[in-house]
């Protein structure tokens, strides 16, 4: 009888892990929906399985055998810990990002990305190799932009996830990139500013800057009123309000190269001499060993599936700026998945 070598076992194990790669995402979503992290956090002290089961915000009684198996998997994912002696559960360090109500919570991103509709395009990954239809449209019958405009619940879920990511990024911006916003900027337009999470943080950190949110009408209609922030609806492909700085966080990655060049040209038209575009977007580096290196590649596929856009390398960014007639640009890495790119048209 032929035996399987250790190397073959490792190779098979790698494929099995990838076959069930979805499991970690959906177990993570389950943990958020069950509020396991909040329950353990609010209890302060570690909890036994029975104690945890009795406090979960679900119909009682809880099937403790099934909860045990979910917790066993979550412990293996290193999100929670179990004491070998007391058999009581507590939070592992990454679990703090599963807690709601603080600026670095990742709960909204977890719920959105693992929503069945937003997962559906991934089942059409190969379909995009032929034809011009994006996987999102194949899966859900509409482009992502039309879909959002006619599905308010999904639009809110999506906006909450974008705000979640923006809070992570703006925390890094405020701490690491003050000079970018304090260098002769008195007015700033956040193009594609959504619900205003980014511009609110910018305005708080730099109160002398007059800030404006610019987005599509249905987005502006759902965005909250923010003190000292102006809201304008419109189409960035047609025009952009004038300002000393134009801020775009995760906007250009939604679009193909020709569309990005068009947007950048509208930016150039809106900027005075000395003005700049502040772009917060992924910069792919295939030689990087950074912890975010793989997620940046995942986001590239996500853009390909959902919008027909892409994440770009430094060389690809330079090509866009050159084609749009920009004079220079500078890339700054920050402690986030995205980098900051300052692009100067003059």
Swiss-Prot record:
The gene is 6OMT. One of its GO terms (biological process) is methylation. This is (RS)-norcoclaurine 6-O-methyltransferase. Pathway: Alkaloid biosynthesis; (S)-reticuline biosynthesis; (S)-reticuline from (S)-norcoclaurine: step 1/4. Optimum temperature is 37-41 degrees Celsius. Involved in the biosynthesis of (S)-coclaurine, the common precursor of all benzylisoquinoline alkaloids such as morphine, sanguinarine, codeine or papaverine. Catalyzes the transfer of a methyl group to norcoclaurine to form coclaurine. Methylates (R,S)-norcoclaurine, (R)-norprotosinomenine, (S)-norprotosinomenine and (R,S)-isoorientaline. SUPFAM superfamilies: S-adenosyl-L-methionine-dependent methyltransferases, Winged helix' DNA-binding domain. Expressed in buds, stems, leaves and roots, and at lower levels in capsules. Localized to sieve elements of the phloem adjacent or proximal to laticifers. The lineage of its organism: Eukaryota, Viridiplantae, Streptophyta, Embryophyta, Tracheophyta. The active site is at residue 253. It catalyses: norcoclaurine + S-adenosyl-L-methionine = coclaurine + S-adenosyl-L-homocysteine + H(+). Homodimer. Forms heterodimer with SOMT2. The heterodimer SOMT2-6OMT possesses 3-O-acetyl-4'-O-demethylpapaveroxine 4'-O-methyltransferase activity, where SOMT2 is the catalytic subunit. Optimum pH is 6.0-9.0. Substrate binds at residues 165, 250-254, 302. Keywords: Alkaloid metabolism, Methyltransferase, S-adenosyl-L-methionine, Transferase. S-adenosyl-L-methionine binds at residues 162, 166, 192, 215, 235-236, 249. InterPro entries: COMT-like, O_MeTrfase_dom, Plant_O-MeTrfase_dimerisation, SAM-dependent_MTases_sf, WH-like_DNA-bd_sf, WH_DNA-bd_sf. Induction: Up-regulated upon fungal elicitor treatment or wounding. Its EC number is 2.1.1.128. One of its GO terms (molecular function) is protein dimerization activity.
């Amino acid at each position: 009888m032929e035996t399987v070598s250790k190397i073959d076992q490792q190779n098979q194990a790698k494929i099995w892990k990838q076959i069930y790669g979805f499991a970690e995402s959906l177990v993570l979503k389950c943990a958020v929906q069950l509020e396991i992290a909040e329950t353990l956090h609010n209890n302060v002290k570690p909890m036994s399985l029975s104690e945890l089961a009795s406090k979960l915000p679900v119909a009682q009684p809880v099937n403790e055998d099934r909860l045990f198996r979910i917790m066993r998997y979550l412990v293996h994912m290193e999100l929670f810990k179990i004491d070998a002696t007391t058999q009581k559960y507590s939070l592992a360090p990454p679990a703090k990002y599963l807690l709601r109500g603080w600026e670095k919570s990742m709960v909204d991103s977890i719920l959105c990305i693992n929503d069945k509709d937003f997962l559906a395009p991934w089942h059409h990954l190969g379909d995009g190799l032929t034809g011009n239809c994006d996987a999102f449209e194949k899966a859900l019958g509409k482009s992502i932009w039309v879909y959002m405009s006619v599905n308010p619940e999904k639009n809110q879920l999506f906006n909450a996830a974008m705000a979640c990511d923006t809070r992570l990024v703006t925390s890094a911006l405020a701490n690491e990139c003050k000079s970018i916003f304090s260098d002769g900027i008195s007015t700033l337009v956040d193009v594609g500013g959504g619900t205003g999470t980014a511009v609110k943080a910018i305005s708080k950190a730099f109160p002398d800057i007059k800030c404006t949110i610019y987005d599509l009408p249905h987005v502006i209609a759902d965005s909250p009123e923010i003190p000292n922030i102006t809201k304008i609806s419109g189409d960035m492909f047609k025009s952009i309000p004038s300002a000393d700085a134009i801020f775009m966080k995760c906007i250009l990655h939604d679009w193909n190269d020709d569309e990005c060049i068009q947007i950048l040209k509208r930016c150039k038209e809106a900027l005075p001499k000395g003005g700049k575009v502040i772009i917060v977007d992924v910069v792919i580096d295939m030689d990087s060993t950074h912890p975010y290196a793989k997620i940046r590649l995942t986001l590239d596929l996500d853009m390909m599936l959902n919008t027909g856009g892409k994440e770009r390398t430094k060389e690809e960014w330079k090509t866009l700026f050159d084609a749009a007639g920009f004079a220079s640009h500078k890339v700054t890495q920050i402690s986030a998945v995205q980098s900051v790119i300052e692009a100067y048209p003059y």
